Amino acid sequence: MKKLNIIFAGTPDISAQVLKDLYKSQYNIQAVLTQPDRAKGRGKKVQFSPVKEVALANHTPVFQPLSFKKNPEVLEQIKQLKPDVIVVIAYGIIVPQEFLDIPRYGCLNIHVSLLPKWRGAAPIQRAIQAGDTKTGVCIMQMDAGLDTGDILNTLEIEIQETDTSQTLHDKFAKLSIKPLLETLEKIEIIKPEPQQGEPTYAHKITKQEGLIDFTKSAWQISCHIRAFTPWPGAYFILDDEAIKVGEFEILYQNTDNRKAGTIIDIYRSGFDIATSDKIIRFRQLQFPNKKMLNIVDILNGKDLDKYIGYKLG
């Protein structure tokens, strides 16, 4: 088989890591597609996407259409390159059927769930939030639907009880190259398989979703916190202030019939709150406009004992 010509489309860190790994392979990366540069921070300094940084470091042409409708010339430029494959991971821009039809072997999407479970924008967070014990990487032949294409390859990954969205994201960034390379090696003979099972949807995360519902079980709250770490962050409301939570542990003791959301006790080692079944101890909290701190450090400058017995929500 001749050396494949590949165009890569992606934007954030996870895409950048896969691109780095792809450069180490025998394949020829003709061009890279990524979202337009953004002005960020107080100084509104223009920043390149992580994928663009990697592409420029490897002297690869970069295309950054606002959309393919607004920049149809990019489609023509891609057609002229005659790629064998286009690899897509977290690109963030809708691609038309005309784009999907360009490469000889089609467009391959790297999706970080075991499809058809968790189609959509936030598969990592939704898998943790739901308490799933496994997830994985799917190499999918893209079609016009939302993550509905046939499956070419999968890699299953366990979700540990300590995994957050960040740690699981990092695992995907490291491991996604393996099933991709396996797929590319067999691209001429691999047989696509239709997705099997009932689909579920990983809807986009909103900032407001971080609010903790203490009427749920301690395990459900653990899943909630880990799903929304680092963004948007899980929090509770105390004195009309949103208090973000950091490190925590579940205390395997009952709540002595105290109502869910009751602040049971405050120690130098933690801030104990009743859930529907157990006690959850927060070892770190972040008050508005402050850093995330250990409880012992917060107690050095703040009187929290007055909240013992207070019911949240």
Swiss-Prot record:
Molecular function via GO:
methionyl-tRNA formyltransferase activity
Which annotated residues bind (6S)-5,6,7,8-tetrahydrofolate?
113-116
Q: Which GO cellular component terms, listed alphabetically, does the Swiss-Prot or TrEMBL entry include?
A: cytosol
Q: Which InterPro entries match?
A: Fmt, Formyl_trans_C, Formyl_transf_N, Formyl_transf_N_sf, Formyl_transferase-like_C_sf, GART_AS, Met-tRNA-FMT_C, Met-tRNA-FMT_N
Catalytic activity of the protein: L-methionyl-tRNA(fMet) + (6R)-10-formyltetrahydrofolate = N-formyl-L-methionyl-tRNA(fMet) + (6S)-5,6,7,8-tetrahydrofolate + H(+)
| Any Pfam family the entry gives | Formyl_trans_C
Enzyme Commission numbers on file: 2.1.2.9
The signal sequence is none
Q: Which SUPFAM superfamilies match?
A: FMT C-terminal domain-like, Formyltransferase
Q: Which HAMAP family does the record cross-reference, listed alphabetically? A: Formyl_trans
NCBIfam families assigned: fmt
Job description of the protein: Attaches a formyl group to the free amino group of methionyl-tRNA(fMet). The formyl group appears to play a dual role in the initiator identity of N-formylmethionyl-tRNA by promoting its recognition by IF2 and preventing the misappropriation of this tRNA by the elongation apparatus.
Q: What is this protein called?
A: Methionyl-tRNA formyltransferase
- Give the species this sequence originates from: Francisella tularensis subsp. mediasiatica (strain FSC147)
Q: Which gene encodes it?
A: fmt
